[in-house]
Amino acid sequence: MSRQLNMDTLRQNFWKEEYLKEMMLRYEWQRKYGTLVKAKQKAKAASRLPRKLPTLLPQASVAPPPPASKTTPSKAPSPAPEPLFLSDMYPVAPNTKALLYEGISHDLQGRYQYLNTRKLDLPETRYLFPITTNFTYGWQLGPPTKQELVSCKMCRIESFFRKNGAFALLDPRDLAL
């Protein structure tokens, strides 16, 4: 049994046009982004190559510098070097940090107790600035409000279900505006 090929001139022209559109799209993409892709590939290939250490040539002995005269004024002491790693968080209080070294996490001490204590602090007091957009949203919420539950079950049932039936016309008071 042979397969039927439903190709008439109209369908054949359609597929030819689709093929040409795809080819033009690929060509345009290649023209637009081809150089960027090649540059990235070259950079990646260059990073994979092993780096060679420079060869050091023996140098002639250099005379030591002349001793500084005692009459020259001494330089002012340089300021303290800045720390290499700047943290996003405020420093931890010493008593909270001491929790790390007391016991082990298995006994709900040590790191476990330290993390739970840190979790109790508000993000505003832990971080210098909002790290993510969720922080910004959360910092604007404020303290949570307590919602009181209705004590009787019938009050909840009567307020939850519609009083006038499922298919009855809606009461104007039932619509949320």
From Swiss-Prot:
Parts forming coiled coils: none
Organism domain of life: Eukaryota
Region Disordered: start-end pairs: 47-80
Pfam families hit by this protein: SPMIP1
InterPro entries: SPMIP1_C
Protein name in the entry: Protein SPMIP1
Species whose genome carries this gene: Mus musculus (Mouse)
Lineage: Eukaryota, Metazoa, Chordata, Craniata, Vertebrata
Gene name in the database record: Spmip1
